[in-house]
């Protein structure tokens, strides 16, 4: 139980490496109000699953002839098994060097009979495989096995393309860096006041440790909320009833980023702007009728999303009115 006067702090209460090879971490953040805990319970998992990036194979173009799009002559594994093996390969590199670039191309060019492994892949400069002996395919005949691979930065919510034909290649569903996120809230009283502790359970692959993922997600959220200060203020009016009206626009952002900012602003405005304030003199509404002089600083707000296309990509704009 934390003293609310000390401010909220993170604590790592458990850390482990599981037999499956995954890393596990359990974290606690307290003290929090109910609104704060609710906001972070929604926002942190979204940030972990959408904003933590890693390098992965996302597409494979196989030169060998496929039989009914299921098997390759002279190779023991099915096509589906081979694609899954590519998806399991963990790639490492300095991610900041690859942000906004790519996709990148890698080549697997071997001749059987042999066991093709991750070390056999020719990778672009700056990218390495973590486990060189990771199995790809068993080539049982004296034939070449040639695969052109696409490498991209992906998150835990990234999905391979669908409807790709044999001529164009095959999509790969990559193993995500964040395997799973669970949250829970525990309530407690401190000197008669209710407070809450947020618990966060994170499972990751070997790309990143849970505490590193949490730190990155927290920075992403902070940076995302900082965008609000860059909102364009394109309409302002002082109403006859003494209220002020403003319209703001913020762009570009992804749908996930919009949803989190929308939730954060709604929660923050409802929580932090709800204190009572006395207005000197009579107060009237737009029709001139008298209203209660005790009112909240922010009387009303509305946040909407506008989608638009840019260079084939879909982005969102946030429109807010206060």
Swiss-Prot record:
GO cellular component assignments: chloroplast; DNA-directed RNA polymerase complex; mitochondrion
EC number: 2.7.7.6
Catalysed reaction equations from the record: RNA(n) + a ribonucleoside 5'-triphosphate = RNA(n+1) + diphosphate
Region of interest (Alpha C-terminal domain (alpha-CTD)), ranges: 280-322
InterPro entries (alphabetical): RBP11-like (IPR036603), RNApol_insert_sf (IPR036643)
Coiled coil region boundaries: none
Keyword Coiled coil: no
Superkingdom: Eukaryota
Enzyme's top EC category: transferase
Function in brief: DNA-dependent RNA polymerase catalyzes the transcription of DNA into RNA using the four ribonucleoside triphosphates as substrates.
Comment block on domains: The N-terminal domain is essential for RNAP assembly and basal transcription, whereas the C-terminal domain is involved in interaction with transcriptional regulators and with upstream promoter elements.
Family to which the UniProt record says this protein belongs: Belongs to the RNA polymerase alpha chain family.
Protein name per Swiss-Prot or TrEMBL: Putative DNA-directed RNA polymerase subunit alpha-like 2
Gene: rpoAL2-A
């Amino acid at each position: 139980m934390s003293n609310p006067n000390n401010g909220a702090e993170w604590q790592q209460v458990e850390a482990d490496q599981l037999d499956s090879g995954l890393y596990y971490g359990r974290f606690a953040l307290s003290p929090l109000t109910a609104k704060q805990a609710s906001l972070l319970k929604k926002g942190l998992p979204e940030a972990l699953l959408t904003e933590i990036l890693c390098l992965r194979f996302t597409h494979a173009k196989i030169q060998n002839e496929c039989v009914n799009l299921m098997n390759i002559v002279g190779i023991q594994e099915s096509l589906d098994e081979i694609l899954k093996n590519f998806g399991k390969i963990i790639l490492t590199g300095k991610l900041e060097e690859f942000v906004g670039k790519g996709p990148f191309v890698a080549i697997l060019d071997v001749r059987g009979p042999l066991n093709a492994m991750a070390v056999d892949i020719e990778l672009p400069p700056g990218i390495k495989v973590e486990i060189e002996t990771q199995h790809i395919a068993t080539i049982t005949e004296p034939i070449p096995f040639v695969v052109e691979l696409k490498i991209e930065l992906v998150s835990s919510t990234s999905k391979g393309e669908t409807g790709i034909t044999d001529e164009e290649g095959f999509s790969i569903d990559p193993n995500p860096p964040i395997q799973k996120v669970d949250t829970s809230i525990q309530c407690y009283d401190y000197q008669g006041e209710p407070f809450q502790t947020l618990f966060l359970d994170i499972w990751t692959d070997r790309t990143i440790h849970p505490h590193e993922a949490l730190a990155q997600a927290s920075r992403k959220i902070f940076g995302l909320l900082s965008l609000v200060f860059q909102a364009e203020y394109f309409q302002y009016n002082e109403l006859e009833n003494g209220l002020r009206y403003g319209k703001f626009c913020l762009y570009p952002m992804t749908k996930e980023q919009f949803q989190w900012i929308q939730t954060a602003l709604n929660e923050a405005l409802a929580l932090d702007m709800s204190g009572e304030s006395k207005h000197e003199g009579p107060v009237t509404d737009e029709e001139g009728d008298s209203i209660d002089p005790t009112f909240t600083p922010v009387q009303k707000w509305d946040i909407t999303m506008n989608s638009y296309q840019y260079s084939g990509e879909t982005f969102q704009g946030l429109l807010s009115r206060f």
